[in-house]
């Protein structure tokens, strides 16, 4: 790091804090991305295996990982971990299966559907994370959570959740399931989440299409406290148009009673 300019050293430090990676990895990734911090962090999170130089995969004990998989695999189907195995996996991690942390792990494993991991998803996911034990996976959790602070990565995680949560073969996501997952992933991120849930339960009562799911994230990040910046002529789904119409009088009423 001594040969670097002071501005580059600052970027290395910031990169290390943000990605929880080593100095060697930070220098390697930044130098390959023209020392643009935002581009480098985004590329790192999308393809960590391209930049991690600590030979994480080389130090992985494949036999140990296979034994770990065998602890969880379905007795009736050795190519997947079923619901009982997932429960054991969560118990070993001391995590609630319904927690956002378990959803983040599923995202990192690129899991296709809830309540199970295929053998390939588990083995590849653990390998990519450089983990051959529960202890190593536990140690990776803060890094995974940190990753979601980057908006592009959170968007990827959010969009993954729709496909993960829905029943295979169904186009839309059942309303109750959608609300449960919105409460998990948008809690603290969408100021009108409770009002949105109330609106859906009172006025919608149908499944949620993918475009509505995806665009709600954009809506949640741009909408003003009084919804005055909402463009009715914009390319928003009808459901979001209807929600704004439902919510505006309630927001105005709340403000007048608190003044």
Swiss-Prot record:
Keywords: Nucleus, Ubl conjugation pathway. Pfam families: Cullin_binding, UBA_4. InterPro entries: DCN-prot (IPR014764), DCN1-like_PONY (IPR042460), PONY_dom (IPR005176), UBA-like_sf (IPR009060). GO terms for cellular component: nucleus; ubiquitin ligase complex. It is found in: Nucleus. The keyword Nucleus applies. The keyword Cytoplasm does not apply. Residues 8-45 form the UBA-like domain. SUPFAM superfamilies: UBA-like. Its main location: nucleus. Residues 60-248 form the DCUN1 domain. One of its GO terms (biological process) is protein neddylation. GO terms for molecular function: cullin family protein binding; ubiquitin conjugating enzyme binding; ubiquitin-like protein binding. It comes from the Eukaryota. Part of an E3 ubiquitin ligase complex for neddylation. Promotes neddylation of cullin components of E3 cullin-RING ubiquitin ligase complexes. Acts by binding to cullin-RBX1 complexes in the cytoplasm and promoting their nuclear translocation, enhancing recruitment of E2-NEDD8 (UBE2M-NEDD8) thioester to the complex, and optimizing the orientation of proteins in the complex to allow efficient transfer of NEDD8 from the E2 to the cullin substrates. This is DCN1-like protein 1. It comes from Gallus gallus (Chicken).
């Amino acid at each position: 790091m001594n040969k670097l300019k002071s501005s580059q050293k600052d970027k290395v430090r910031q990169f290390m804090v943000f990605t929880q990676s080593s100095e060697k990895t930070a220098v390697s990734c930044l130098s390959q991305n023209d020392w643009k911090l935002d581009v480098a962090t985004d590329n790192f999170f999308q393809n960590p295996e391209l930049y991690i130089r600590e030979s994480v995969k080389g130090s992985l004990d494949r036999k140990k990982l296979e034994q770990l998989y065998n602890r969880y695999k379905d007795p009736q189907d050795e190519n997947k971990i079923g619901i009982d195995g997932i429960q054991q996996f969560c118990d070993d991690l001391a995590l609630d299966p319904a927690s956002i942390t378990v959803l983040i792990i599923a995202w990192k494993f690129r899991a296709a559907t809830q309540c199970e991991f295929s053998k390939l998803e588990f083995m590849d996911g653990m390998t990519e994370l450089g983990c051959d034990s529960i202890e190593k996976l536990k140690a990776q959790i803060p890094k995974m959570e940190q990753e979601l602070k980057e908006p592009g990565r959170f968007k990827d995680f959010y969009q993954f959740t729709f496909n993960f949560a829905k029943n295979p073969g169904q186009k839309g996501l059942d309303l109750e399931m959608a609300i449960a997952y919105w409460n998990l992933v948008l809690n603290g991120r969408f100021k009108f989440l409770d009002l949105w849930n109330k609106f859906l339960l009172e006025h919608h009562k149908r499944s949620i299409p993918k475009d509505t799911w995806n665009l709600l994230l954009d809506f949640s990040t741009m909408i003003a406290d009084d919804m005055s910046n909402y463009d009715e002529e914009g390319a928003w789904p009808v459901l979001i148009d209807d929600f704004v119409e439902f919510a505006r009088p309630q927001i105005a009423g709340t403000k007048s009673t608190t003044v």
